[in-house]
């Protein structure tokens, strides 16, 4: 298992629904979340999918690389997730 940081930007209009969808996706692929930070609502530098603001959420987690690939694909399909970024941590 490797350690990752995962950041998502979600639609303001579906804050709670999207948060539970993200948690369900992580659980579905056996991603172990070690830390969970809500960075709150922020103005976006430029509109993403016609949205001017987004909810930023940051996770520290550990998982197999294949599970992270599947999570990223699920996030691309989800219309409520505007952007996501996964970074592998050293060690």
Swiss-Prot record:
Any GO BP: translation
Instruction: Show the InterPro entries listed in the entry.
Output: Ribosomal_bS6, Ribosomal_bS6_sf, Ribosomal_S6_plastid/chlpt, Transl_elong_EF1B/ribsomal_bS6
| The name this protein goes by in its record | Small ribosomal subunit protein bS6
Family statement drawn from the similarity comment of this UniProt entry: Belongs to the bacterial ribosomal protein bS6 family.
Q: Name the CDD domains on file.
A: bS6 (cd00473)
One GO molecular function term? structural constituent of ribosome
GO-annotated cellular components = ribonucleoprotein complex; ribosome
This chain's function reads: Binds together with bS18 to 16S ribosomal RNA.
Q: Which organism is it from?
A: Leptospira borgpetersenii serovar Hardjo-bovis (strain JB197)
Q: Which UniProt keywords apply?
A: Ribonucleoprotein, Ribosomal protein, RNA-binding, rRNA-binding
Pfam families in the record = Ribosomal_S6 (PF01250)
- Gene3D superfamilies referenced in this protein's UniProt entry, alphabetically: 3.30.70.60
């Amino acid at each position: 298992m490797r350690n990752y940081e995962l950041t998502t930007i979600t639609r303001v209009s579906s804050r709670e629904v999207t948060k539970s969808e993200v948690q369900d996706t992580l659980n579905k692929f056996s991603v172990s979340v070690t830390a969970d930070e809500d960075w709150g609502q922020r103005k976006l530098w430029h509109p993403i999918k016609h949205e001017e603001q987004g909810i930023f959420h940051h996770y520290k987690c550990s998982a197999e690389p294949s599970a992270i690939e599947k999570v990223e694909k699920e996030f691309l399909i989800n219309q409520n997730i505007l952007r996501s970024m996964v970074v592998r941590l050293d060690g």
